């Protein structure tokens, strides 16, 4: 609610002073990590001992930095060129600032009776209203005051705090309808309708941060002769113009303005006046000042990138028209690295055609300093990006974007061209790899009959977020790398491993519906899309995105460090190899054993065959304590029974082992139905197998498929199947086995890497004995 103006305020205003040149009000972070308040005079005198400005918000920090830059530009009246700048860089201190502040001290008094700093004396509304300080203290997020201790409203501010928010208001105040002030001819029925946000609020601001505040100030102190910039000789900050009055400055006084960086850094986009008493500020009057169109300010504003607006060119008939390139709050800064470190204009069809985008001139300035040898080759820098994200017709601040990148000056020098190329191409790698993860989520959604768009976007963002820290750390290492190309190859492998883990998590949690899949249209006709095919596509896309050889698809469930599946598989291989050799040579005992195994419905018959063959000690005495004997027995018994069903009465070996092309279950079923899209019965059996929830149901579905394999004379590696059956019974094993069957089903000969020599290679003993 508005507060009534206090009658004592004019008396208090004449009695009090808050001199920003001598009073502590700027929050700074010292090199020792301590935050303190300093005056304008102190901040320049001690800049070499300070780390940075430490504002209440990132946007406030930038607004205060731009104020300091305007002071420094004006105090040195330049720099005009690199030589001027280097003299400042080489000097022990910024000696010109102190006398400059003395000369303009009256204009830096927050409470001055006639020229209060960045305010309009005697500003008032027609009703004499004084409004809550919420009008100038930014709410982040929307509707939630940043200072939670001051909920639900900001009732009072110290003079130091108020000074900071006054600077912030001119830079980032919201748009929307504001109460009109006396003598503002834009007022209609007591209101002034939206005229835009503060000037800095329209920017995707980027600046360079050095090791100290002194370095930061000088690195952003762009010379007047910088290519692409045009600073007028009469460029000066707000305090060297006539004091503002209520309403807009007369147009005749704005001719040729803004005149340069000093003018823009202090542009008076608002008219305001603080109301206070002896202990602080308790209210404010806030209205519109001088609105500023962002069109083609690229010759005066160095702290933002620019994009060419074809729509505005068509509308106005003027060419070219550049607008500030705002930050995308959903994307980390490193995804835009190309626009920051590559100095050439982008997408110019011909030399005479204006570029579609322009790099921030402040970064062109760093490149120029490097080209002229004014900065060391590997000096550490931070590129910082700050921006306000406005909501609802820009009448509120929804969020604040802040990000940074740590790198070195090498990336701004021609000697670092190779490093820049690898850094930018690694961003392309990351973006494409995140797209692959998003496509996996989309394919799984399609396979389950869901809308693919939202999962794609969500998983892509998750992929970018997962790569974020890895890329930033890699970029720091890149600066010192002798072989940037080799380091990028390392980055690609790291990124691949990370996104494979995320994809694995997604696939592990895929639903039974996604495993069942859908028949979908593709450029090659009908296609059965399920979670297994989605996984194959994911690996293919990821390998392509990261310029790696085809990602090796593990066709069997991972054994990790658990020796149990291998031990169980070795036993099954030994038993089945022996029985199969004896059966194929016509030994009666083996024929009898096979008949008993084939008709076995329980474990008794299988146990009898194992006992008669002398394999019981091996089954009961497996070397690893990690083996779950109950699960091992069930796996071995089931595998023997299935093999017997498969083998009898065939004269060829139905159990076949090979490290190079293992007869895996999924691959065998694919041979059974090469066109699975048109093989409904086989596909349904395979789906039911994968969705089986109990071990008896699993074996029942396997028996049906094995019968089909037997009829087609298609072999199977039963040692691997035994390992699958053992793993299936472990926690998480059902999904792992189903995925391995799906991978082998969709694997194509010659395009998928065969399993690497590992525990599977040891399943084929070379000293098989005939024990039947």
Question: At which residue positions do the language-model features occur?
Answer:
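Long, acidic, intrinsically disordered low-complexity segments
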Residues: 92-109, 555-604, 708
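Non-catalytic, well-ordered alpha-helical scaffold segments
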Residues: 156, 211, 215, 591, ...
């Amino acid at each position: 609610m508005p507060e009534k103006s206090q009658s004592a305020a004019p008396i208090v205003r004449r009695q009090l002073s808050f001199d920003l040149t001598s009073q502590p009000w700027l929050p700074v972070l010292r090199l020792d990590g301590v935050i303190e308040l300093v005056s304008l005079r102190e901040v320049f005198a001690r800049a070499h001992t300070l780390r940075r400005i430490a504002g209440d918000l990132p946007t406030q920090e930038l607004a205060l930095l731009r104020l300091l830059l305007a002071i420094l530009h004006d105090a040195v009246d330049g720099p005009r060129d690199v030589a001027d700048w280097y003299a400042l860089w080489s000097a022990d201190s910024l000696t010109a600032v102190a006398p400059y502040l003395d000369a303009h001290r009256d204009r830096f008094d927050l409470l001055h009776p006639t020229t209060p700093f960045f305010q309009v004396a005697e500003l008032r509304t027609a009703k004499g209203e004084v409004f809550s300080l919420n009008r100038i203290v930014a709410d982040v997020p929307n509707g939630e005051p940043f200072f939670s201790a001051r909920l639900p409203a900001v009732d009072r501010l110290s003079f130091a705090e108020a000074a900071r928010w006054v600077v912030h208001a001119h830079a980032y105040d919201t748009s929307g309808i504001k109460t009109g002030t006396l003598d503002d001819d834009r007022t209609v029925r007591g209101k002034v309708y939206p005229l835009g946000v503060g000037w800095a609020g329209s920017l995707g601001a980027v600046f360079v941060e050095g090791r100290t505040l002194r370095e930061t100030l000088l690195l952003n102190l762009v010379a007047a002769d910088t290519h692409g910039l045009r600073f007028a000789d009469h460029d000066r900050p707000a305090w060297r113009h006539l004091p503002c009055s209520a309403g807009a400055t007369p147009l005749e006084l704005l001719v040729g303005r803004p005149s340069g960086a000093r003018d823009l850094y202090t542009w008076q986009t608002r008219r305001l006046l603080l109301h206070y008493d002896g202990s602080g500020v308790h209210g404010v009057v806030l209205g519109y000042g001088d609105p500023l169109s962002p069109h083609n300010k690229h010759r005066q504003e160095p702290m933002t990138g620019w994009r060419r607006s074809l729509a505005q060119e068509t509308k106005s008939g003027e060419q070219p028209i550049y607008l500030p390139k705002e930050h995308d709050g959903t994307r980390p800064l490193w995804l835009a690295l190309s626009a920051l470190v590559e100095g050439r204009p982008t997408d110019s069809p011909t030399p005479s055609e204006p570029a579609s985008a322009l790099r921030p001139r402040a970064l062109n300035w760093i490149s120029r300093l490097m080209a002229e040898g004014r900065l060391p080759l590997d000096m550490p820098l931070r590129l910082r990006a700050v921006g306000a994200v406005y909501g609802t017709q820009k009448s509120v601040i929804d969020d604040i974007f802040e990000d940074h990148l740590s790198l070195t000056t090498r990336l701004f020098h021609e000697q670092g061209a190779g490093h820049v190329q690898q850094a930018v191409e690694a961003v392309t790698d990351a973006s494409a790899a995140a797209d692959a993860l998003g496509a996996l989520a989309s394919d799984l959604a399609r396979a389950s009959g869901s809308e693919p768009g939202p999962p794609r976007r969500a998983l892509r963002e998750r992929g970018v977020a997962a790569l974020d820290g890895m890329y930033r750390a890699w970029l720091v290492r890149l600066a010192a790398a002798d072989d940037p190309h080799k380091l990028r190859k390392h980055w690609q492998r790291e990124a691949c491993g990370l996104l494979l883990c995320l994809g694995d998590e997604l696939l592990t949690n895929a639903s039974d519906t996604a495993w069942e899949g859908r028949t979908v249209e593709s450029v090659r006709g009908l296609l059965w899309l399920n979670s297994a095919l989605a996984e194959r596509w994911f690996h293919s896309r990821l390998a392509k995105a990261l310029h790696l050889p085809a990602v090796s698809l593990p066709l069997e469930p991972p054994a990790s460090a658990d020796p149990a599946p291998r031990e169980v598989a070795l036993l099954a291989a030994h038993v089945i190899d022996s029985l199969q050799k004896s059966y194929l040579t016509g030994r009666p005992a083996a024929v009898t054993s096979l008949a008993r195994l084939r008709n076995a419905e329980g474990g008794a018959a299988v146990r009898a065959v194992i006992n008669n063959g002398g394999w019981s000690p091996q089954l009961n005495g497996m070397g690893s304590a990690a083996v779950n004997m109950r699960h091992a027995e069930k796996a071995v018994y089931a595998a023997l029974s299935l093999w017997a069903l498969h083998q009898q009465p065939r004269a060829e070996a139905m159990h076949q082992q090979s490290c190079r092309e293992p007869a895996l279950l999924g691959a065998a079923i694919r041979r059974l139905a090469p066109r699975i899209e048109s093989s409904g019965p086989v596909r349904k059996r395979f789906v039911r197998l994968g969705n089986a929830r109990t071990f008896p149901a699993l074996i029942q579905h396997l028996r049906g498929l094995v019968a089909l394999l037997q009829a087609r004379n298609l072999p199977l590696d039963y040692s691997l199947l035994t390992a699958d059956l053992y793993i299936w019974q472990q926690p998480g094993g059902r999904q792992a086995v189903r995925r391995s069957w799906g991978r082998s089903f969709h694997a194509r000969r010659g395009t998928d890497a065969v399993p690497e020599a590992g525990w599977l290679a040891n399943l084929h003993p070379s000293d098989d004995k005939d024990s039947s």
